[in-house]
Amino acid sequence: MEGTDLLLAGVLFLFAAVVAVPLAARLGIGAVLGYLLAGIAIGPWGLGFISDVDEILHFSELGVVFLMFIIGLELNPAKLWQLRRSIFGVGAAQVLFSAVILGGLLMLTQFKWQAAVIGGIGLAMSSTAMALQLMRDKGMNRNESGQLGFSVLLFQDLAVIPALALVPLLAGSGDDHFDWMKVGMKVLAFVGMLIGGRYLLRPVFRFIAASGVREVFTAATLLLVLGSALFMDALGLSMALGTFIAGILLAESEYRHELEIAIDPFKGLLLGLFFISVGMALNLGVLYTHLLWVVVSVAVLVAVKTGVLYTLARIYGLRSSERMQFAGVLSQGGEFAFVLFSTAASQRLFQDDQMALLLVTVTLSMMTTPLLMKLIDKLLSRRFNQPDDEDEAPWVEDDKPQVIVVGFGRFGQVIGRLLMANKMRITVLERDISAVNLMRKYGYKVYYGDATQLELLRSAGAEAAESIIITCNEPEDTMKLVELCQQHFPHLHILARARGRVEAHELLQAGVTNFSRETFSSALELGRKALVSLGMHPHQAQRAQMHFRRLDMRMLRELMPVHSDTAQISRVREARRELEEIFQREMQQERRQFDGWDEFE
């Protein structure tokens, strides 16, 4: 693809994403499905703007590569050892049982047994990119079903190596066509990467960090990710697996958080590119020609994988509600099928349109997953949000909530317990199923679902409540809820959690003045204790804390309309000088009046 064509493709990708994803979000079908539909629209079977799908699809796998690197950073060898039962137990069982069932069904549809084996293995894999994105959207990454889902995906990535090695064996039906020397070299290169990464990465990043140039650190991070991916690709292995291992090797290093920050902006955009490319790869010609076969195949694929996953989750001990989410989120075919089926086709394992039919089935199964998850959400909402006639009478006469608490993580739990202890009537909205189950046991009135949906807010009693406390993890959800409440429930007194100064500015601009930055108060309190431990009188430390809080809040309001970095830095320096002057005056006053507490305490 030439430079001009590549630039045009980039513009088309961005345009399609900007148009399709907001429309999909407004329709409630999710960003992932929006990306897929955008890909169909601009691909060879849509408007035909882009025809070189294979090259773009290979490039777009970088989105999955960046995602797996960040996941690797969040783990460490000790955590992986803890997950060994779920990785090599549930993960291996899922691939084995799904591959056997699906491969057997393919043999019934006139696939040769060799093609059926490869087809079964490829269809048994799930989409790492889609599943992880949906798990994050649904809050599953905070509960056991999310950890189990990640374990299954990790085993599937590990299964890439033997699956690809199996293709030439099946194609040649003997050892004559199989180069054991080449396989041995690949294994040695892989082991060399592990050993080299273990002993070289930290010193290299220590040397780069010592330069103090942030751009060089970002460049080194990109070099590591892309280099690992290229190395694994040259070995004929999974690029995502290579970057995942690189992430694990750096998971316990002091540079972990800095690496996450450097990579994060690229991850989201490239993931979107991947989903658009998958949509472009959908062969609508094959779909039209074999419509009935494809529809039945998609239904069977999703049903078989859902059944296998649900059964394994039950054996593992997940609750029924978590089983449904776990089975649904991994029910689709995955991106690895594109690689495996292409390799098999190059070895002439497939006949006629067999490969095209399998790829269309995989692509359409990926498009069904967001819809299936919405259906599961509705079923769970019905189960958890309808009144239970067998419940005991509430301990307050008026059943209408005074306060709605959105999100019941560590931040929301403290607020909820304080309100309950003071006999306030609260209703909690939470999308983590395990948290909903737990809270109901302890007598909380909880609604399961996405609080940014207007109907859920109505069901929770927003029209009768006095206040709403928003403690969402994602700032986007917080701002969407603020807008929703201001538009439909203007009487509600809005209180919100801000993760930092940027979110605080956004809340102020939206007219929300009652917010709390999640680490600010606790950091101030610890700072006060530090001053006391260093010999400062408790009275003086308390006043220092008070002045700092007051000045910081004033700065927050003053800097809200300022967008220039230079202007912000200048204002921060002025504020620091002002704070020093206040502390100097306070010290002089304390020398004159050392004891006693004033009206501010």
From Swiss-Prot:
Signal peptide: none
Entry's Gene Ontology molecular function annotations: glutathione-regulated potassium exporter activity
Organism the protein comes from: Enterobacter sp. (strain 638)
Similarity annotation: Belongs to the monovalent cation:proton antiporter 2 (CPA2) transporter (TC 2.A.37) family. KefB subfamily.
Gene3D superfamilies the record matches: 1.20.1530.20, NAD(P)-binding Rossmann-like Domain
Record note on quaternary structure: Interacts with the regulatory subunit KefG.
Cellular compartments per GO CC: plasma membrane
UniProt keyword Transmembrane helix, yes or no: yes
One example of a Gene Ontology biological process annotation: proton transmembrane transport
Segments forming domain RCK N-terminal: 400-518
Name of the protein: Glutathione-regulated potassium-efflux system protein KefB
Keywords: Antiport, Cell inner membrane, Cell membrane, Ion transport, Membrane, Potassium, Potassium transport, Transmembrane, Transmembrane helix, Transport
InterPro entries, A to Z: Cation/H_exchanger_TM (IPR006153), K/H_exchanger (IPR004771), K_H_efflux_KefB (IPR020884), Na+/solute_symporter_sf (IPR038770), NAD(P)-bd_dom_sf (IPR036291), RCK_N (IPR003148)
Domain of life where this protein originates: Bacteria
Compartment(s) where it occurs, according to its Swiss-Prot or TrEMBL record: Cell inner membrane
Record bears the keyword Flavoprotein: no
Biological role: Pore-forming subunit of a potassium efflux system that confers protection against electrophiles. Catalyzes K(+)/H(+) antiport.
Entry's transmembrane regions: 5-25, 29-49, 55-75, 87-107, 115-135, 152-172, 177-197, 207-227, 230-250, 261-281, 284-304, 326-346, 356-376
Membrane topology value: Multi-pass membrane protein
